[in-house]
Regions:
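Acidic ATP/Mg2+-coordinating residue in the GHKL
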Residues: 77
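Conserved glycine-rich
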Residues: 123-124
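Short beta-strand/loop element within the Bergerat-fold HATPase_c
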Residues: 57-69
Length: 146
């Protein structure tokens, strides 16, 4: 997952820089059995949203770790956050919290739905922590390679 996270950060750096947002990768190797392209899509879509819904001068951090039988990747941002009443719906197809913002930032409303299905395909789970005005942190955990 660390190499996937680094590739995503490299690919999204121009977009992040263009919006005045820093993007960083940290952690240790976290290996999983999986389809590399789908793992890339998971991290890419999470980071793309973290950039889109961030603030000028904000940051996105991608962290990887392997512990307790799981390999995890966490994408954290300093963005606008997600209100509690929307948090259980953001992985639905075409659901958008802020339709006015999504029109200006582009996208189809499918990115997080793709994440959900790709994580399920790999027998993983998703956890979200967010509060309006305080950013969002999404952790995806997969069974680790023993």
């Amino acid at each position: 997952l660390l190499s996937v996270a680094s590739a995503v950060a490299d690919d999204l750096l121009p977009s992040a820089d263009g919006q005045g947002i820093s993007i960083a990768v940290e952690g240790s190797p976290a290996n999983v059995y999986g389809v590399k392209r789908l793992l890339y899509e998971i991290v890419y879509n999470l980071c793309d949203n973290a950039i889109k819904y961030n603030r000028q001068g904000g940051s996105v951090k991608i962290s990887t770790v392997s512990e307790g039988g799981f390999s995890t990747v966490t994408v954290s941002d300093t963005g606008i956050g997600i209100a509690p009443e929307y948090q259980n719906r953001i992985f639905e197809r075409f659901f958008r919290v802020d339709k006015s913002h999504s029109k200006s930032s582009g996208g189809t409303g499918l990115g997080l739905s793709i994440v959900k299905h790709a994580v399920q395909y790999h027998h993983g789970k998703i956890e979200l922590t967010s509060a309006p005005g305080n950013g969002t942190s999404i952790t995806v955990s997969f069974p680790a390679i023993q």
